[in-house]
């Protein structure tokens, strides 16, 4: 998502691979996977971010998510 990060690509990819394996193990559909990802984001914001900062961080997260989507190729 962000261009620069204090986390290494290896750290992110390792965690992503492990989470993906759990979703695969449970046969999670894309819809269920996205629902779980959304619930994780909501829980992190509600439990680990000051109430005064939640909306701003959620908006930045949403913008980063949208900007990371691949546009379909047109011919």
Swiss-Prot record:
InterPro entries from the UniProt entry: UPF0352, YejL_sf
One Pfam family recorded for the sequence: DUF1414
Gene3D superfamilies (UniProt xref): YejL-like
Family per similarity comment: Belongs to the UPF0352 family.
Protein's recorded name: UPF0352 protein VV1_3121
